[in-house]
Amino acid sequence: MAVISMKQLLEAGVHFGHQTRRWNPKMAKYIFTERNGIHVIDLQQTVKLADQAYEFVRDAAANDAVILFVGTKKQAAEAVADEATRAGQYFINHRWLGGTLTNWGTIQKRIARLKEIKRMEEEGTFEVLPKKEVALLNKQRARLEKFLGGIEDMPRIPDVMYVVDPHKEQIAVKEAKKLGIPVVAMVDTNADPDDIDVIIPANDDAIRAVKLITAKLADAVIEGRQGEDAEVAFEADTQAESIEEIVEVVEGSNEA
């Protein structure tokens, strides 16, 4: 049984890699072919590796792991926030602040400041302050929420980090590796897979592809926490589409 079917991956465009000139040779084993200057990801491997990622995240969640979802590019920001929240976990979907993990003490101070400003408003302090000071506090709160709102209630440094596009999120990945935090990631054909513990070869530039993979890992968290089966699992015969179908889809898309 697979948690994501070949058909779902195809429909979401997970197979589209980058232009061949932008590839990272270390991703060669995850590439099926090249068509019209674009690398095509081997979705048979993606199906298998997505299963492994699902199991890894599910098992971590079953052991009360704190899981941080990271994706700051515009194609990933919404899905990362929505799915992490749905799973009761944490996220960073705007710029990664250097030291978010390796300088956690300082980050906690900024989070404490965010909570303090919120508390001031709730307790009515804003009502007795000058308007100019309230405006400055609101501006400070908005900035802190933008960068730290998704980890405001994170109790500790995460036990697992899920990343959309480790090529873009290199600083986040390096911080995780320095602290021994395992990294699960959607890895496109332009990325270096060496620092990724659990690789999901996938197009990380398409919103539908990011949503599909991210939602499935959120399902894994929910299943791990609840001890229940996730929404859908696919029998092997639902993946009967051959890998050649991927080539047909790519050629058709490129010719359109």
Swiss-Prot record:
**Which superkingdom is the protein from?**
Bacteria
| Ribosomal protein among keywords | yes
Q: Which keywords appear in this protein's UniProt record, sorted alphabetically?
A: Ribonucleoprotein, Ribosomal protein
Q: Which GO terms describe its cellular component?
A: cytosolic small ribosomal subunit
Which GO BP terms, alphabetically?
A: translation
Under Gene3D superfamilies, the record lists: Glucose-6-phosphate isomerase like protein, domain 1 (3.40.50.10490), Helix hairpin bin (1.10.287.610)
One GO MF term on file is: structural constituent of ribosome
Q: Name one Pfam family in it.
A: Ribosomal_S2
Which InterPro entries does UniProt cross-reference here?
Ribosomal_uS2, Ribosomal_uS2_bac/mit/plastid, Ribosomal_uS2_CS, Ribosomal_uS2_flav_dom_sf
What HAMAP family does the database record attribute to this sequence?
Ribosomal_uS2_B (MF_00291_B)
The record's section on PANTHER family has: 30S RIBOSOMAL PROTEIN S2 PROKARYOTIC AND ORGANELLAR, SMALL RIBOSOMAL SUBUNIT PROTEIN US2M
Similarity comment: Belongs to the universal ribosomal protein uS2 family.
Name of the protein this chain belongs to: Small ribosomal subunit protein uS2
Protein encoded by which gene: rpsB
